[in-house]
Swiss-Prot record:
Record GO biological process: protoporphyrinogen IX biosynthetic process from glutamate
Catalysed reactions, semicolon-separated: uroporphyrinogen III + 4 H(+) = coproporphyrinogen III + 4 CO2
Site (Transition state stabilizer): D74
Lineage, highest ranks first: Bacteria, Pseudomonadati, Pseudomonadota, Alphaproteobacteria, Rhodobacterales
Function: Catalyzes the decarboxylation of four acetate groups of uroporphyrinogen-III to yield coproporphyrinogen-III.
Pathway where this protein functions: Porphyrin-containing compound metabolism; protoporphyrin-IX biosynthesis; coproporphyrinogen-III from 5-aminolevulinate: step 4/4
Subunit and interaction comment: Homodimer.
SUPFAM superfamilies referenced in this protein's UniProt entry, alphabetically: UROD/MetE-like
The species this protein was found in: Paracoccus denitrificans (strain Pd 1222)
E.C. no: 4.1.1.37
Enzyme class: lyase
Protein name from the UniProt record: Uroporphyrinogen decarboxylase
Record has Isomerase as a keyword: no
Sorted UniProt keywords: Cytoplasm, Decarboxylase, Lyase, Porphyrin biosynthesis
NCBIfam families xrefs: hemE
Length: 342
């Protein structure tokens, strides 16, 4: 059997039709997801019940035949495994107990202690490795340290990550220690996902764009480099996708600086610019505006084709610039796939 298309792209091969998957492809836009989510009772129960987490991971594969399935979990399971309280408020999102001092960082569990909490996630990966179609690539993931830290410091998502920036300004050494602890735990977490059957892993740095200058180097580039180097040492041949969202011009050179096999792009950068400045270093992933899966129409088709064409001279995985939204029309996803695959 020939190698899976996404693995070929991640090795630098240019394919006539780009492989495709979507961030948050298992999500509320799908009626079957909503039914399974109701069966679970709450979001965390869905994440920690392997049969149900595997089921929602498989649903978009059955419906659309995406080239990859991404593990259904949440980036905030890791801080919970490090000892923080985690709960979800209906209509508002996640809440965490907070880490705002050197003492708070010191009180976190060591990286080696995360696996008891996260063992259901690894079981989900094992189920998926058995049940996915043979041609479908299984992607594991974690939040990148900066993004995870923003939630651990603020106790919730914030529009400007101000609490994390304040902690960083007040006690840079303590904040760096927090980043180090998350980095160590992320290495062990992704390594365990790979051991359970993940064929690719992705680092989501959703708030990388709020880091500037030296901070971007210290808290986005360097942790990613450490994580990728450690994973490559433990698991040679396992590709890593990095997503420093809203990095803008810093997308250029990110693969070289971190060792990532692929850089995922948000839709704030033009595909033509990224093809010239980012794709020269290897595979790129992206970058359709998810809002087009809500509005649909000819603009969805033409923009999908434009992105495919822009990246056609090098290795490319088609994806969105951010996660698909609950308001997206499932029929528009089918239209997008038709525009890509013909």
């Amino acid at each position: 059997m020939s190698e899976k298309t996404i693995l070929r792209a991640l090795k630098g091969e240019r394919l006539p039709v780009p492989p495709v998957w979507m961030m948050r492809q298992a999500g509320r836009y799908l009626p079957e997801y909503r039914a399974t989510r109701a069966q679970a009772g709450d979001f965390l129960s869905l994440c920690y019940t392997p049969d149900l987490a595997a089921e929602v991971t498989l649903q978009p594969i059955r419906r659309y035949g995406f080239d990859a399935a991404i593990l259904f979990a949440d980036i905030l399971l890791l801080p919970q495994a490090l000892g923080l309280d985690l709960w979800f408020v209906t209509g508002e999102g996640p809440r965490l107990s907070t880490v705002t001092s050197a003492a708070g960082v010191a009180a976190l569990k060591p990286a080696a202690a995360i696996h008891d909490t996260l063992s259901p996630v690894y079981e989900t990966v094992r189920i998926l490795a058995r049940e996915l179609p043979r041609e479908t690539t299984l992607i594991g993931f974690a939040g990148a340290p900066w993004t995870v830290a923003t939630y651990m410091v603020a106790g919730r998502g914030t529009p400007d990550q101000a609490p994390a920036h304040a902690f960083k300004a007040e006690d840079r050494a303590a904040f760096a220690a927090l980043i180090d602890r998350i980095t160590e735990a992320t290495i062990d977490y992704l390594s365990a996902q790979i051991e359970a059957g993940a064929e690719v892993v992705k680092l989501f740095d959703s708030w990388a764009g709020s880091l500037k200058g030296r901070d971007f180097d210290d808290f986005a580039v360097e942790p990613a480099r450490r994580i990728i180097a450690a994973l490559k040492a433990r698991h040679p041949g396992i590709p890593v996708i990095a997503f420093p969202r809203e990095a803008g011009p810093r997308y250029a050179g990110f693969a070289r600086a971190t060792g990532a096999d692929c850089v995922a792009l948000d839709n704030s950068v033009s595909a033509d610019w990224a093809a010239a400045e980012v794709q020269k270093d290897g595979c790129v992933q992206g970058n359709l505006d998810p809002r087009l899966l809500v509005s649909g129409g000819e603009e969805l088709v033409s923009e999908t084709r434009r992105i495919v064409q822009a990246f056609s001279r090098g290795p490319h995985i088609f994806n969105l610039g951010h996660g698909i939204t609950p308001e997206a029309d499932p029929e528009n996803v089918a239209r997008m796939l038709e525009a890509i695959r013909g």
